[in-house]
Amino acid sequence: MGLVSGEVGSRAWAKREQVLAGARRAFLREGFAATSTDAIAAEAKVSKRTLYSYYPGKEELFADVLRRLTIENPQTQVLASVEEMEPMGLAELREALVVLATKVVSTMMDPDYLALLRTIIADTHRFPQLGEIYRSTVPERGFRVFLNLMERMRDRGTVDVPDAEAATRLFFGPIVTYTLLDGLFKPGEQPHPPAPEKIEHIVDLYMKAIA
């Protein structure tokens, strides 16, 4: 019985991944507004009934595509890496933040992610919920997890951050400037992420601010 249940679960997971991959291709090609559930089903090579068995609508699909590209990306595992951080001192914290910043930059400079950001900007005036989908799916979750890390480090006496929210914004701010100036606002060009040594310099400046 357990084997059968496992096989069914594996097939369901594979089918969901198939739907998600089709949705990603459709959204990247047509944007959010112009993509219908019919188009997504056709791209994923599934019936609409199958699509709706996993997702009630294209908003939920779009959110899942964003999640998979960013904080739940199986290659970078950005969210999980922050949740699992338990540095024992400033040296370990610096090392962990360099790794994290590198992952965040890699994720936010991904061409597909930048293309979806442009879609959100272009379509939000017609679909105001897109902005909220993005906020709640990506930045707010990542922000909250990092803020919790700063609070833990402060409570242990590892860092001196009276305002954990400000410390969180201070960490992500420089990274976002690369996303905007060297990625999002250069359509048609390859994104230019900062060099590894530049990321280390950013983290070193950050460490001086919180130590």
Residue spans for each PLM region:
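Hydrophobic alpha-helical connector segments
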Residues: Q77-Y113, A167-T168
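Conserved hydrophobic residue
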Residues: F32-A33, L130, V159
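Hydrophobic/aromatic-rich alpha-helical bundle segments in the mid-to-C-terminal region
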Residues: R154-D204
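Hydrophobic/aromatic residues within well-ordered alpha-helical segments
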Residues: K15, K58, L69, L97-L100, ...
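Amphipathic alpha-helical packing segments from all-alpha helical-bundle domains
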Residues: E95, S106-I121, P128-D155
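Short, basic, alpha-helical segments at the C-terminal edge of helix-turn-helix-like DNA-binding modules
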Residues: R67-N73
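Helix-loop "lid/cap" segments that line or gate small-molecule binding pockets
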Residues: E86-P87, T102-M109, L116-H125, L205-A209
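Basic, helix-initiating cap at the start of DNA-binding domains
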Residues: M1-E30, A34-V46, S53-A63
